[in-house]
Amino acid sequence: MQHFRDKIVVVKYGGNAMVDDDLKAAFAADMVFLRTVGAKPVVVHGGGPQISEMLNRVGLQGEFKGGFRVTTPEVMDIVRMVLFGQVGRDLVGLINSHGPYAVGTSGEDAGLFTAQKRMVNIDGVPTDIGLVGDIINVDASSLMDIIEAGRIPVVSTIAPGEDGQIYNINADTAAGALAAAIGAERLLVLTNVEGLYTDWPDKSSLVSKIKATELEAILPGLDSGMIPKMESCLNAVRGGVSAAHVIDGRIAHSVLLELLTMGGIGTMVLPDVFDRENYPEGTVFRKDDKDGEL
């Protein structure tokens, strides 16, 4: 636990953890716990289920291509409203039920993110998916002010482009870019599965640890929904983050279980070369490791 004192931990909040009331409450409590013991949590959130629900309510068709939401201007209006006005506010409220910790912000605020339009490669063909962006710059000075004030930033993933357009940023992508930019110690990505399956749906293909080069080699063949998550982990680790984790958000207190228990509960992505002395005792040794293996 002492290992994480004064270190930034970026958590991408999503999946069942953001729709089940008990899991939402447990997640908020975990963020406050991390802050109380001296870590510096930063939450980056998506809002897929809530966006889909609102699109249905207003009669707009939602579509996904290559794991990304196709974002027309009409869909973008809903995305912006739901992410910052609903999901972000709800999480800020849950965290602040424990005390005045959380501050809501977005990629639009104080130039945190700058984006450019993203094309998605589907079956080898670059495909336009609308107002979906990639982050090309992170200016975290205002975010660091929030962190250093002892607060927990809750970041909505919408961002302006240099063309003046507002883009929908995949929250997994944003979390990885932010973690690397602010020198985070760890990135954790909450999902609705136990971790990384190298050959989904074969349950025996679940791995508890993988190095960056190994992940890069299998990335194109992964299930489409996992590609943005694992790409985010890869980019974070390549950007200097000590480790990135994909964990099962359906388990209450999954963040603490992954960070603070022997062997963790999910999949840990590590740099190709690492010194286990720089990691808390036992946490690099994972569930499916052989005796003596790093």
Swiss-Prot record:
GO cellular component: cytoplasm
Disulfide bonds: none
Pathway membership: Amino-acid biosynthesis; L-arginine biosynthesis; N(2)-acetyl-L-ornithine from L-glutamate: step 2/4
Annotated InterPro entries: AceGlu_kinase-like_sf, AcgluKinase_fam, ArgB, Asp/Glu/Uridylate_kinase, Glu/AcGlu_kinase, NAGK-C
Enzyme's top EC category: transferase
UniProt-listed GO biological process terms: arginine biosynthetic process via ornithine; L-arginine biosynthetic process
Binding residue positions for substrate: 47-48, 69, 168
Xref: PANTHER family: N-ACETYLGLUTAMATE SYNTHASE, N-ACETYLGLUTAMATE SYNTHASE, MITOCHONDRIAL
Name listed for the protein in its UniProt record: Acetylglutamate kinase
